[in-house]
Every structure is written in structure tokens, then in C-alpha cells.
């Protein structure tokens, strides 16, 4: 089941639990706006290249739309649509005043020079500048993009609208970025895991973790979990997978990855088949890579007692059912990985106020939001007698439905 079908399925299940009528259901499901633009740029060799860019603006009932821009050769309109919808529910679960959006350009960043990436970003911004804005739609980095990409968008947008640092988040600190933003999603995963384990009478200390994906989110989560006494027993990334049942030295691994661009060849652990990473013996599994990696083919072999979804849509609905029967507790993506968008909200607030928070305040506020979010999800689970995924979906959908109704949009 693809990401859009799975997201729609979860929405429909939540809608039924909430008793929403069909008219309101359709209002919530259909995107506010879908944008498709053609971006033609001169390449460094003088030739012209054309790329297709997308931006799906899903919902703005609770505030400006919010979501990343990804640069990837397989940017798919259906996936962008699904991720935009997920952002709507995610921001509602986090209880921050945003709706959902997502965008991307079908390109391979590694095949483009820095100057070509800059030209592409600026042309894309020129095409959509009148459809985004501080109080309209606020982009952020995603797969294949970074703070420099956001700096180019900010600069190009400002040519049309005046200096507007709050138009994007995930910016460099020197242009109004927030302290703590780089670690935010990974730190949010730590706080989410802490809340889940605490609810089951456990703590991070002494638990064995497996982390699939060692990019920004996975590496920060692993580092912070280790600092809290957790043991990382296996890690994987695009280069390979490693395992050490006694615990991997994450500080040494981070140094190795920086020098070698991947976990492959790390001497402090044994090399294993990357396809086996999800079924390694552990207490907590953290998928922090791509979507759809936990499916009906491997779900039956998963040994973890808890799954904390750091990636977007890592678990197929068929796998959900198999894991539920095994008693595996899944903390869903729309709560577990909301730390990034929450600190993006803090960045936006700081930009609008023209006042910078220190990192301690950012992290303290993030922990408070994550703890409140977990309590709110659990309350919905009790109300509707459902699992954590449906608890999160009913929480998010209900908040958006109430805002939609109050604004008179469902009529």
C-alpha cells in the first residue's frame, strides 16, 4: 500500500471513530491547492535543463501551511500529497498553529553543482513566491535540501516581498535560524521514547535500541539516547549495517561517519546484512530512514517490544495488524517525529518577534510539547478504545475538524 492510500485509510478510520459526516470528511481530505511548475535553468556547461516542481498545500484551517521541500529524482505527486496531509495531522497533534503542506523538485542534488542548485531553487521560488508566505505557507528543509537551500528561498522571496525571515524555517543561524533546530527531530524522538517507556514503567537507561537510518534524525536520536543510558546495538544507513550486542560507541561512530560518509567499515561493530536490521533483537526499534520499510513480509520477524517511528510512514497498515497481534507497541510518526516541526514553529515565532531564544529554552519547550502531546494521544486512546496510531490520528483529525467547523468551511 503506497503512502497516500495508507494515509487516507488511517484518516477514514479516525473519521469513523469521531463520527464525522461525509461532507466534512471530504472537506478535510481534499487538498486546498496543488501546484505544479516547470523550472528551466542554464547548467554550468551552457545547456538548458528542465525540472518539475510540486507544492501541495493541504489544509490551513488552524493556521499557515507548513512542510518541507525535498529534492529527489523520484519525487512523486501522490507521495507529496500524502506527506502534506500527514503534516496537517502532525501539526494538530503537536498543537501548534499550522496546517500541512509538502513540496519537492524531481532532481538528483548530487548530479548538480552548488551554483546549479542555487539557480534551480531561485527559479522554483520565483514560480511559487506569491503562493507561500509568513502567514500563508512556510517551507522547511527535507530530503536533499538543507539550511543553505532555505537561505536561497529567503533571499529570492525577499526580493518580491521585503526581508521576511519567517517565510522559511530550518535556516542558518546567521539568517534567523533557531538554536537547537538541527537536533530537534532526533531530540523529539528521544522525548517520545522516554514518554512511551515511562508509560510502561521503564526508562531509556538499560534498554537496547536499533536505529535504521543514520542521517540527521537517526544520528541525533542515537547520540541522545546513549547520553541517557540507552544502548544502541545496531545501526544502518545507505552504505551498510553494523551490530554490537554490547553497545556501539556512538561518539566513535559519528567520527567514522564524518570521515567515511557512512557506517560501513566501522571497526567497533560487526558488519551485518542491511536487510536484517529491522529484525535484530532489541527492546526498541527506531526506523529513521524511508517509508514503507516495515511490511507484511518482515513484520512477523520483528523482535522489538516497542517501535518509535522517526521516519514518515515507515509501517504499512498490513504490518500494523501483524505487530498488534504480537503485542508490539507502535508510537506513530505523526507524534514521534514532530520535534522538528515543533522547533520550526519556535523559529517562526522568534522571527516574527525579532527575539532569539537560548538553546536551553528551545529544548525545555520542546520537551513540554512532546510530553503534552503524548498525554493527549493517550487520552484519545482511552476515549475511543484504540491503539496509539488511531489515538494520534483521531486527536489530529478532531482538532482540524473543529477548526474547520468553527470557520464555517464544511457547509
From Swiss-Prot:
Family: Belongs to the Glu/Leu/Phe/Val dehydrogenases family.
Enzyme Commission code(s) on record: 1.4.1.3
Residues annotated as catalytic: 102
Source taxonomy: Eukaryota, Viridiplantae, Streptophyta, Embryophyta, Tracheophyta
UniProt keyword Oxidoreductase, yes or no: yes
Gene of this entry: GDHB
Catalyzed chemical reaction(s): L-glutamate + NAD(+) + H2O = 2-oxoglutarate + NH4(+) + NADH + H(+); L-glutamate + NADP(+) + H2O = 2-oxoglutarate + NH4(+) + NADPH + H(+)
Keywords of this entry: NAD, Oxidoreductase
UniProt cross-references to Gene3D superfamilies, sorted A to Z: Leucine Dehydrogenase, chain A, domain 1, NAD(P)-binding Rossmann-like Domain
Annotated GO MF terms: glutamate dehydrogenase (NAD+) activity; glutamate dehydrogenase (NADP+) activity
Record-level GO BP terms: glutamate catabolic process
Protein name: Glutamate dehydrogenase B
SUPFAM superfamilies documented for this protein: Aminoacid dehydrogenase-like, N-terminal domain, NAD(P)-binding Rossmann-fold domains
One Pfam match: ELFV_dehydrog
GO CC, alphabetical: mitochondrion
Organism: Nicotiana plumbaginifolia
